[in-house]
Design a protein with these regions (language model features):
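Membrane-integrated ABC transporters
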Residues: 1-30, 45, 49-55, 73, ...
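Extended non-transmembrane interhelical loops and adjacent amphipathic helices
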Residues: 1-2, 78-118, 167-169, 238-249
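Alpha-helical transmembrane segments of MFS and MFS-like solute carriers/permeases
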Residues: 17-24, 58-62, 151-155, 176-180
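A hydrophobic transmembrane-helix motif
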Residues: 30-37, 125-167, 172-214
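Hydrophobic/aromatic residues in alpha-helical transmembrane segments
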Residues: 32-39, 57, 73, 77, ...
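Membrane-water interface at transmembrane helix exits
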Residues: 37, 41, 45, 66-74, ...
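Hydrophobic transmembrane alpha-helices
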Residues: 58-65, 210-226
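Cytosolic ends of transmembrane helices, especially the final helix of ABC transmembrane type-1 domains
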Residues: 220-247
Length: 251
C-alpha cells in the first residue's frame, strides 16, 4: 500500500480532490439504509404523506449526488493513472523495439505490461479510496444495531482472508463469485434471524433499524470484498512496474 500512497500523492491537489469526493460519496451512500430506517420507524407511525415525499426526494437527491461524484472521481483517477503509467508503457514499447529478447522474456514483459494496463482502471483506485468510508458504515452500524456490526465485521474479515488466499485455494473466478454470493446471503440470514429474535424478545431494536442495518452491513461486506481485490491488484501492479522499470533500465 506504500506504493499506492506514493502514486496517489504525486499530485497533492488531485489527491485532495479525490479524498474529498470519496468522503462525499461515503456520506451519500448512507442514504438508502437511513431512508429505510426513517420510513419504517417514522412514516408508518405517523402516516403523514408529506413526510414520505420529503424523505423520498431527499434520498433520491443524495443518490444522484453519489452517482455524479463517482463519475467525476473516475475521470480524475483515469487522468492520474494515464499521467503516471503511460510514460512507463511508452518506454517499454520503445525498449522492446530496440532490443532483441528471448521469447520467454518477451512473454514475461508482455504479461507485466498487461497487468499495468489492467490495474490502472479507475475502479481499483476507487475501491481503495472507499475503504475508510466502508469502515464508517460499520461505525454507523454500532449505533443502530451493535449485533449487526459485530456480525458484519466477522464476515468482512472472512471475506478479506478468502479473497487474499484465493490463489492458494485454487478457486476459479466463477467459484470466487459463488463464494461471495454465499457469504452475502449467509450474513443477511444471520443478521435478520438474530435481529428478529431481539425485536420480539427484548424490543431493543425497531423493524426499521433491523432492515436498515442489514442494508448497511451488505454495503460494508461488498466494500471489504472490493478492497481486498483491489489490494491484490495493486500488489500485482507494483511487481509488474518493478519488472518493467528493471527491463527498461537494463543495458
Amino acid at each position: 500500500m506504500r506504493g499506492f500512497l506514493h502514486h496517489l500523492f504525486r499530485d497533492k491537489s488531485v489527491a485532495t480532490m479525490l479524498l474529498t469526493a470519496s468522503f462525499i460519496i461515503g456520506l451519500c451512500a448512507l442514504a438508502p439504509s437511513l431512508f429505510v430506517l426513517i420510513v419504517l420507524d417514522k412514516y408508518l407511525a405517523s402516516g403523514i404523506t408529506s413526510t414520505l415525499i420529503s424523505l423520498s426526494v431527499g434520498a433520491i437527491i443524495l443518490l444522484c449526488f453519489e452517482f455524479a461524484f463517482r463519475q467525476n472521481r473516475a475521470s480524475m483517477i483515469q487522468a492520474l493513472n494515464r499521467k503516471i503509467f503511460q510514460p512507463i508503457v511508452n518506454a517499454l514499447n520503445k525498449k522492446i523495439k530496440e532490443t532483441q529478447i528471448s521469447g520467454e522474456e518477451f512473454k514475461t514483459i508482455e504479461k507485466a505490461g498487461a497487468v499495468i494496463k489492467g490495474a490502472t482502471n479507475s475502479s481499483i483506485t476507487g475501491y481503495i479510496l472507499d475503504w475508510p468510508f466502508v469502515l464508517m458504515f460499520v461505525i454507523a452500524l454500532l449505533f443502530i444495531n451493535w449485533t449487526a456490526a459485530i456480525i458484519a465485521s466477522i464476515f468482512m474479515i472472512i471475506m478479506m482472508v478468502l479473497t487474499a488466499q484465493r490463489v492458494n485455494l485454487n478457486l476459479q473466478q466463477d467459484s470466487t463469485a459463488n463464494l461471495e454470493i454465499f457469504l452475502m446471503g449467509l450474513m443477511t440470514i444471520t443478521i435478520l434471524a438474530i435481529g428478529s429474535y431481539s425485536v420480539l424478545q427484548y424490543g431493543n431494536i425497531t423493524l426499521g433499524a433491523l432492515i436498515g442495518s442489514n442494508i448497511l452491513a451488505s454495503r460494508a461486506l461488498q466494500g471489504a470484498n472490493k478492497f481486498a481485490k483491489a489490494r491484490e491488484a495493486i500488489k500485482q501492479r507494483d511487481r509488474a512496474t518493478a519488472q518493467i522499470i528493471s527491463f527498461v533500465n537494463k543495458k
